[in-house]
Amino acid sequence: MAQTDRRATGDGLLEKLVGVRRVAKVVKGGRQFGFSALTVVGDGKGRVGFGRGKAREVPVAIQKAMENARKNMISVPLEGDTLQHPITARHGAAKVHMQPASEGTGIIAGGAMRAVFEVVGVHNVLAKCIGSANPVNVVQATVKGLVQMSSPEAIAAKRGKNLEEIVGGG
């Protein structure tokens, strides 16, 4: 589950630590221990990125993960403070289903998905993780789903039609 480390940095980005794991490398003389960190970074207005960092010490691993997350930021078209439409995405064995929710619903999502929604600026969403609950795969599937989401205006422009033809101006 994501830790509640929601820090606003000097550049206006929200950082969230999803998890830290201790990993071991077996060598001739025994085991060498290190740490792996997974973080998500966002501006709360539709930009999000995730990163992984590995190091011998926890703070260094977290710092590397934050830097990677800042480098890999993408923009997400939001509908106010929720999603444009329901979407399902998968990465590996992790499958996530996300759908928009009405005002006042809140973020109904588990651990790693919740962290992504909090930093991207989504305040009302219903989400479910199906299959693997591995935080790395869940975060990647969530971000993949957010990237696939597009606004009705973008779909209309892509198809060369007007908005009423797409949404059924009815």
From Swiss-Prot:
Disulfide bonds: none
Keyword presence, Ligase: no
Ranges where the S5 DRBM domain occurs: 13-76
SUPFAM superfamilies with a match to the protein in the record: dsRNA-binding domain-like, Ribosomal protein S5 domain 2-like
Molecular-function GO term, any one: structural constituent of ribosome
Top-level taxon in the UniProt lineage: Bacteria
InterPro entries reported in the protein's UniProt record: Ribosomal_Su5_D2-typ_SF (IPR020568), Ribosomal_uS5 (IPR000851), Ribosomal_uS5_bac-type (IPR005712), Ribosomal_uS5_C (IPR005324), Ribosomal_uS5_N (IPR013810), Ribosomal_uS5_N_CS (IPR018192), Ribsml_uS5_D2-typ_fold_subgr (IPR014721)
GO biological process: translation
UniProt keyword terms in alphabetical order: Ribonucleoprotein, Ribosomal protein, RNA-binding, rRNA-binding
A single GO cellular-component term on record: small ribosomal subunit
Function description: With S4 and S12 plays an important role in translational accuracy. Located at the back of the 30S subunit body where it stabilizes the conformation of the head with respect to the body.
Comment text on domains: The N-terminal domain interacts with the head of the 30S subunit; the C-terminal domain interacts with the body and contacts protein S4. The interaction surface between S4 and S5 is involved in control of translational fidelity.
Subunit-structure text: Part of the 30S ribosomal subunit. Contacts proteins S4 and S8.
Family, similarity comment: Belongs to the universal ribosomal protein uS5 family.
Protein name: Small ribosomal subunit protein uS5
Organism: Nitrosococcus oceani (strain ATCC 19707 / BCRC 17464 / JCM 30415 / NCIMB 11848 / C-107)
UniProt lineage: Bacteria, Pseudomonadati, Pseudomonadota, Gammaproteobacteria, Chromatiales
